[in-house]
A protein has these predicted regions:
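Bacterial N-terminal signal peptides
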Residues: 9-19
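Bacterial N-terminal signal peptides that target proteins for export
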Residues: 1-11
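Cytosolic catalytic domains that perform sulfur/thiol-centered chemistry
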Residues: 22-326
Length: 326
């Protein structure tokens, strides 16, 4: 069982703070939208307010809520209730606890097959000629996960809403409680398998200086002073660039000129990011893609999988501070 709930709680503590319908026949597929210029992978609330009514634009809320019980145990909760309480008008739900993950896998949030993912996105109105804006209300790791999955199947016309739902409301954006069902579209699969790393590739990276391994968890976790997984520390050879370092104090992504200081400019090096369960790792990967890095993958199993195998080494380094400090 994964411990992703704890990973996301840790990231929040460090500064990141479906509709089910039945019908006798499926709705007719929407006609192809007019092709639009490729948009930036990061859009502002002002941009979204201006383009919200564009017929080719699909807005999706990818929120998963992290809740705790009286004993302090954390768990993931479907974001449906928070969506129904108020969302960006016209938005749909990108359900990472539902059909955007493999329902038959033992581990939560396991990637579905490319075809199943494309079909699920198509059911949300995402097609080859649409544009997609993704957001969440939990620091953007969930939105980044869906963004990376879209990229994995070859879809590049998606963006994150900078600052998430908080930025939308801060800019005066209204919230809606109305559900909107979009006609389904066809989303093609042009798979990019190199965007996902497996345990074997990560093992090989330990002795391969040509591969860069990035741990996106907070420095206290990287050093091994505290852990939520089977064993403390980090994968040998990894450097630490915590996800919290991607954001300013308002929850917006930091300017590119500041982020490039964290990641450097060796754009062609094979780079693998990891976290606890393959969600938060997509944030660093998203930033690196924006900065022009060309060979990035996320380790989907991350420390959930890695630390469960006693044959996989872990390194403790109390004097380490990571690339970005605390």
């Amino acid at each position: 069982m994964r411990y992703l709930e704890k990973t996301l709680q840790l990231l929040v503590a460090c500064g990141l703070a479906i509709l089910v319908g039945c019908s006798e026949a499926p709705p007719p597929e929407a006609p192809a939208a007019e092709p639009q210029p490729k948009m930036d992978s990061l859009v502002s609330a002002a941009w979204l307010q201006e383009h919200l009514g564009d017929p080719d634009l699909v807005v999706l809320d990818a929120t998963v809520v992290i809740e705790s019980d009286a004993a302090g145990n954390f768990q993931s909760v479907n974001g449906r209730a928070s969506f129904e309480a108020g969302h960006i008008p016209g938005a749909g739900v990108a359900d990472l606890m539902g059909d955007l993950s493999d329902p038959d896998a033992d581990d939560q949030y396991t990637l579905p097959s490319p075809e199943a993912f494309a079909a699920a996105m198509g059911a949300l109105g995402v097609g080859d000629d649409t544009r997609v804006v993704l957001y969440d209300r939990m620091g953007m790791p969930w939105a980044a996960r869906v963004w990376w999955m879209l990229r994995w199947i070859g879809f590049d016309n998606a963006a994150l809403l900078d600052g998430g739902l908080n930025a939308w409301t801060a800019a005066g954006g209204e919230l809606s409680t109305e559900a909107v069902a979009r006609p389904p579209r066809t989303l093609s699969v042009n798979l990019r398998p190199d965007l996902i790393a497996d345990q074997g590739e990560v093992r090989a990276s330990i002795d391969d200086e040509s591969i860069r391994l990035i741990d996106v968890l907070p420095a206290i976790h990287f050093r091994g002073e505290w852990t939520m997984y089977e064993r403390p520390g980090h994968i040998p050879g990894a450097t630490n660039i915590p996800t919290a370092q991607m954001f300013d104090e308002t929850g917006h992504f930091r300017p590119d000129e500041e982020l490039v200081v964290l990641f450097g400019d060796d754009h062609d090096t094979r780079t693998i990011t990891y976290c606890g369960g393959g969600i938060a790792a997509t944030l660093d990967a998203f930033v690196m893609a924006r900065l022009g890095f060309t060979d990035i993958a996320i380790y989907d199993g991350s420390l959930d999988e890695w630390t469960a195998d006693p044959e996989n080494p872990m390194e403790i380094c109390f004097e380490c501070f990571g690339d970005s400090g605390e």
